[in-house]
Regions:
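Glycine-rich adenosine-cofactor-binding loop
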Residues: 14, 103-108, 116, 120-148
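Phosphate/diphosphate ligand-binding glycine-rich loop within oxidoreductases
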Residues: 3-118
Length: 148
């Protein structure tokens, strides 16, 4: 990986983030695909969240993932929030499009993409969700949105 001033910057913000596998995973995939991206973790204390979000724009970062405890509070610092994220009251992805910061909630995307990738359609099926972690609410909401 050759990092230059043109390398696109990505990351994850949370408190703490040292436990996250995201940097290792994203940098590995980026390197294998030949993308000019770098992804790093940023420990952001709750009282510094506004400064951190302004830093995304100021540094020209392409975007960040958002983890606990910032998924709700981050919304107040964004220019736009996707309708699904608004309904959930939770943002886990911030995209910087030429200085406009938009928040999304992509927590349920993997839940639906994995079976489809394997040729399994979950629409119209009975599904059991075990647990109530951060992905449960977005997944259940999306199931109700996509149910026939």
């Amino acid at each position: 990986m050759n990092i230059t001033a043109k390398t696109k910057k990505l990351g994850i913000i949370g408190f703490p983030v040292e436990h996250s596998f995201s940097p290792k995973m994203h940098n590995y995939i980026s390197d294998k695909l030949g993308n000019d991206y770098i992804y790093t973790g940023f420990t952001v204390a709750p009282d510094s969240l506004g400064d951190a979000v302004r830093g995304i724009r100021a540094l020209g970062m392409r975007g960040v993932n958002v983890t606990a405890p910032h998924k709700t509070e981050v919304m107040q610092y964004l220019d736009r929030v996707d309708p699904r994220a608004k309904r959930l009251g939770s943002v886990n992805t911030v995209v910087n499009d030429n200085g406009v910061l938009t928040g999304y909630n992509t927590d349920s995307d993997g839940f639906f993409a994995a079976p489809r990738h394997s040729g399994i359609e979950v629409r119209g099926k009975r599904v059991l969700v075990m647990g109530c972690g951060g992905v449960a609410k977005p997944t259940l909401m999306r199931m109700t949105e996509e149910s026939p």
